[in-house]
């Protein structure tokens, strides 16, 4: 039988986000005249995870135009879009820890209630502190631009020049503060890593 440490903690329940609502906003405008038209749109999405750590925010902007000159002899079209995604990840191993962890362990440090308790023992840790004392996320950006120039030589004859470019960037970030069990076990004041990846076409 396990030791009774005098507390009553529902570890699994604390890991669940009870208000994991999402929201989405969208705005679009367009206009122009006979020789010029334009359109632009922007959107924002936010969704919290079912747990207390994960979330996702997304911002997007699109713009485009079409212009005609020289009485329709020359047409120019352009489009530009970019999307930024901010994500916070979760270590799902904390749920396994929550199921098997002694519920009489304290959630907060008994000597310093502003900190999460540090638990010792084989494969034993505070699953709430494991998430709260660590930042594990990623930032992505997708960009796409294309332009087309069309020359209408004759009513049934034209020539076009098209240019396009797309890029992706990803920044993976991890920050473990000094109160995290990883830092305490390894006698470190914390840990931070930042990795970046980029591709273009």
Predicted regions and their residues:
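Surface-exposed loop/interface segments of Gram-negative outer-membrane beta-barrel transport/assembly proteins
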Residues: 1-8, 50-54, 60-144, 160-162, ...
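Residues embedded in well-ordered regular secondary structure
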Residues: 1-52, 90-93, 130-133, 150-152
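Outer-envelope beta-barrel architecture signal
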Residues: 25, 34-38, 72-78, 155-161
């Amino acid at each position: 039988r396990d030791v009774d440490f005098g507390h009553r903690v529902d570890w699994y329940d604390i890991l669940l986000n009870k208000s994991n609502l999402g929201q989405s906003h969208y705005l679009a405008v367009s206009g122009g005249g006979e020789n010029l038209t334009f359109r632009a749109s922007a959107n924002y999405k936010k969704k919290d995870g079912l747990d207390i750590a994960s979330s996702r925010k997304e911002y997007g902007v699109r713009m485009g135009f079409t212009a005609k000159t020289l009485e329709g002899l020359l047409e120019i079209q352009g489009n530009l879009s970019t999307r930024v995604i901010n994500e916070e990840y979760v270590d799902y191993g904390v749920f396994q820890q929550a199921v098997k962890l002694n519920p009489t362990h304290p959630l907060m440090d008994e000597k310093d209630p502003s900190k999460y308790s540090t638990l010792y023992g084989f494969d034993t840790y505070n699953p709430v502190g494991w998430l709260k004392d660590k930042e594990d996320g990623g930032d992505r950006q997708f960009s796409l631009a294309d332009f087309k120039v069309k020359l209408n030589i004759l009513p049934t004859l034209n020539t076009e020049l098209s240019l396009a470019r797309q890029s992706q960037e990803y920044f993976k970030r991890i920050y473990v503060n000094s109160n995290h069990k990883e830092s305490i076990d390894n006698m470190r004041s914390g840990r931070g890593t930042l990795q970046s990846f980029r591709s273009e076409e």
